[in-house]
Regions:
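AAA+ P-loop NTPase catalytic core and its hallmark functional loops
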Residues: 1-168
């Protein structure tokens, strides 16, 4: 990954999340799955103040935990979130590699931290990502596997698989 974050783009069922999880496994890093949806906000990503024992303290969100602990953060369906929520990730994903938490210390990304965005094209609720965000990723377009290649893969992986199941 050479220090880069990835954006895996393509149609549904092309293995984007499977690839992201396998990359984390190959590198031996923990994974934080971050579901991006239309109403996700900065607090859901970075964290927010909470009351514990009469004291206000910061409760980390999945992005800040991943950043601090050197994990792989999978930003699932990143093109469903609004720009306002995604803007908090700009300094995280660019050369600064920091998260600014208002009222708290800056969180510097662990050297091993990587973020992998996934997105589908052209489905209800999705939209184009702005250029500023896309420029912070290496974009990989995931191809759709042909029926013929899927059958070959299934037969190679499961030699005893009956033809009727491979043909479905």
């Amino acid at each position: 990954l050479c220090g880069e974050h990835l954006l895996l783009a393509g149609h549904k069922a092309t293995g984007k999340n499977v690839l992201a999880e396998n990359l984390a496994a190959v590198f031996g890093r923990p994974v934080w799955d971050v579901s991006m949806y239309v109403n996700v906000d900065a607090a859901a990503l970075i964290g927010a103040d909470t009351l514990r024992g009469g004291q206000v303290e910061f409760r980390e969100g999945p992005v800040s935990k991943c950043a601090r602990l050197g994990g792989f953060g999978v930003l699932d369906e990143v093109n469903m979130a609004k720009n306002e929520a995604l803007a908090v990730l700009h300094a995280t994903l660019d050369h600064r590699r920091v998260i600014d938490v208002p009222g708290y210390e800056r969180i510097h990304l662990d050297e091993a931290t990587r973020f992998i965005g996934t997105m589908n094209y052209g489905y209800a609720g999705t939209r184009e990502l702005n250029e500023a965000l896309v420029s912070r990723f290496v974009v990989l377009d995931m191809p759709v596997i042909s029926d013929e290649n899927l059958k070959k893969l299934l037969r190679r992986s499961f030699p005893t698989l009956k033809d009727q199941w491979a043909e479905q």
